[in-house]
Amino acid sequence: MYAIIKNGGKQYKVKEGEVVKLEKFDLGIGEKVEFDTVLMGQTAEGEVKIGAPIVEGAKVVGEVVEQGRNKKVKIMKFRRRKHSMKQQGHRQYFTAVKVSSISL
């Protein structure tokens, strides 16, 4: 059983019991979160439900387990033959959610 949810402009494939890193949102650790924008899902019996654009009545419930920052991404701009370069770094915030139930 799995579902494809939309959060923060991105799509994620989630399964029950799985921990997923999503875009940061302001909730404390241990708080419940619900996702109503389920784009597609498969039931335990193997039936696939495809939304147009979302599956009506479908819901994914999870619990926040961690708030943090990802590894640093380095951006390097290099100008050839000019002996010039520019280095920049970025660390994206994330919220880790453990999926507790999927209802389609």
UniProtKB/Swiss-Prot annotation:
Cleavable signal peptide: none
PROSITE patterns noted in UniProt: RIBOSOMAL_L21
GO biological process, one term: translation
Membership in a protein family: Belongs to the bacterial ribosomal protein bL21 family.
Keywords: Ribonucleoprotein, Ribosomal protein, RNA-binding, rRNA-binding
Disulfide partners: none
UniProt-recorded name of the protein: Large ribosomal subunit protein bL21
The keyword Translocase is annotated on this UniProt entry: no
Subunit architecture: Part of the 50S ribosomal subunit. Contacts protein L20.
Keyword rRNA-binding: yes
One Pfam family per UniProt: Ribosomal_L21p
Gene Ontology terms, MF aspect: rRNA binding; structural constituent of ribosome
InterPro entries: bL21-like (IPR028909), bL21-like_sf (IPR036164), Ribosomal_bL21 (IPR001787), Ribosomal_bL21_CS (IPR018258)
Function: This protein binds to 23S rRNA in the presence of protein L20.
GO CC term (a single one): ribonucleoprotein complex
Naturally occurring in which organism (per UniProt): Francisella philomiragia subsp. philomiragia (strain ATCC 25017 / CCUG 19701 / FSC 153 / O#319-036)
Residue ranges the record marks as coiled coil: none
